[in-house]
Structure formats: structure tokens, C-alpha cells
Amino acid sequence: MLRAPSRFVRSWITAAVVGSVLAGCGSSSGEPASDKARPAAKTDVTVDPIKAATELTDTKGVKVSLKKEPERIVCLFALCDDILTELGIVPTATNSALLAHPDFLGEEKAKEVDVIPGGFIAPEVEAILSHKPDLVIGLGDTHGKLAPALKGATTFWAMQPETWEDSVGYLRDLAALTGRTAEGEKAEKTFRTKLAAAEKTPSGKTALIIYGSDENFGVATPESDVAASLFPKIADYPWKSRGVEGSYSLEEILAQDVDVLFVETLSFGDADGKLSQKLARNPLWSKIPAVRNGDVHEVNPEVWAKGRGTRSLGIVLDEATAALR
């Protein structure tokens, strides 16, 4: 019986992936997969004006204070890169491969952005500071430990996105701090409009997003996976977080009659095969309707698992709605 990893295992798995990391599996819930999520509220396409600021309390209650608009920003995880791209800003240095995606900078221009050595889990402080950043943005539960070493030399902002609403909030916050208010409002409007359009014609199909590098796969749940938080609006998505120790077996997934599967393969160094290919070794895999009908989609993990921002989520919506038709 194959089981998805716990939050601890997921954090360990994704921390080993070069470039970025998924957030953990989320808040506790002992409810079974058959418990349907509550109907998602309709997306409001109204965008409130963004006011430029040098000090603010972010969408998660963290206080951020700068002396002036930041010009040199170092990104330690992909949401930062996503937001900066939406705002028309290129990071001074990054720790993500997202910028190489054609809908971001593309491979050639992305090569011009310096990469912070040390990997996602342990970016080198000296390398970060060598870029003389005005602002360093990282993932709270991974990079928060860097705060003492960066204190006094730069401003460190720890983000912790769990839902698409969080990502929109961070977009607005960074737009305010950089003075790119018009760009922020435009990006938010574009995303909200796309999401509202997608939810007007939801699919009746049952969908599932899984992630991992081997048979110990994980299930992305709407409570704390940003891409998955979109799915209750556009499909039947009956997967809920089971907390730190929770997991889903392949038998449970089979029982849900999944029509469309989205697979995020998280590789360790050199690619050693797709997750869907590895799961195919289990005889239960072939019995899942999505597998049987050829509706398994290997997606780009840089966008689906790591991007988290409005540009990445727009791509997720485009790809997901096309597959769910």
C-alpha cells in the first residue's frame, strides 16, 4: 500500500529539490477524503487601489519596514520571482529556476540573473550579502533561521503563502513597497478575472494533484497548497489536509474515481524518471480512471509546485481547465 508522506517528510523531500520548495501539507483535519470541501465563494474581480508605502503589515501579519523603495532584491524562493516579474522587476539574485520558464524571463535572460549558492535549504549568507540587497525575501518556515545573520545588513522578509489569496496579498504588499502600484493592480485584476471566468464553468470531473520523486507521493490539499487552493472552484476536488501525520493511500485515491491526475515530479539532482512512471509499477495505479483513460498530466513543478504567484497560478488555471474539459 503506497502512502503519501507526512508534512515532515514532505518538507524534507522538497527541501532537497534544487531551486525551491513546496510548503507543508497544512492544517490538521482528520476528515476522510470523501468529505467534500465547502462550496468555494465566488471570486470578486474588484481590485482595491494599492498605496505606495515604506512600512506595512503584510497579509500574514508580519511587519516590514524599509528606508526607501528597494532597488536590489534577492529572492530565496519562487513566489518572490513570480511577484517581481508581475511588477516588471528583475531580481538581483535568485534561488529559483522559475525565471527560465518562457512565460517569465525565458532561458537566455534568466541566465543573466545571479544564482545564490547553497541550495534552497541553506543559501549562503555571504553570497546573499555580496549583492548588497535592500530586501531579501524567503520562505518563513525554511529561511526564517537566516534572519539573525542578515539583521543589520539588510531587511529580511519571511513570507508563508498557503492559498491563492495569500499570494495575491503578497503581490499587493510588494507592489506597495516597490512603488509599482499600477503594475500590482493590473496583475491582480488579470488573475482575478481569469479565475472568475474559470469558475463560471466548473468541470464535473474529479481531479487530483500529487507530488513527489518516488512511490512515497504526496497529495496537494487546498488548505495549504497554493495551486490546489484553486481547484475547488474549477473541479470536484475532495482532498482535505489530514494534518502532520496524515496521508492518503493509493487505495483511497482509487476509491475516489479520479478522472484527471496532475503530477508534479520533484527531482533530486539528475532527473531519474517521472513520478507517474514510477507509480505505474504498482498494479493499483492502472485501475485509476485517469490512468486507464490516459488523462494523467505531468506538469512543470517550477510553476505548479513552487511558483505560487499570480503569474504561475494563471498558467495553472490555463493548463488545468484545458485538461478538465
Residue ranges and their predicted role:
Residues R72, F77-A127, H131:
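A short, structured surface patch at a secondary-structure boundary
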Residues K145-D214, D295, V303-R325:
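Extracytoplasmic substrate-binding proteins
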Residues L2-L79, A182-L208, S267-Q277, V299, ...:
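Bacterial Sec-exported substrate-binding components of ABC uptake systems
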Residues L98, G218-G246, V303:
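Alpha-helical, coiled-coil/dimerization segments enriched in small aliphatic residues
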Residues T59-G61, I116-V125, R242-S249:
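Short helix-initiation/N-cap motifs at beta->coil->alpha
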Residues L99-F104, H143-K145, Q160-D173, T206-A228, ...:
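Extracytoplasmic ligand-binding site segments that recognize negatively charged/polar headgroups
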Residues E185, V260-R325:
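Structured C-terminal subdomain patch of bacterial secreted/periplasmic proteins
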Residues V125, L129-G138, T155, I253, ...:
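Proline-aspartate-enriched helix->loop->beta-strand connector
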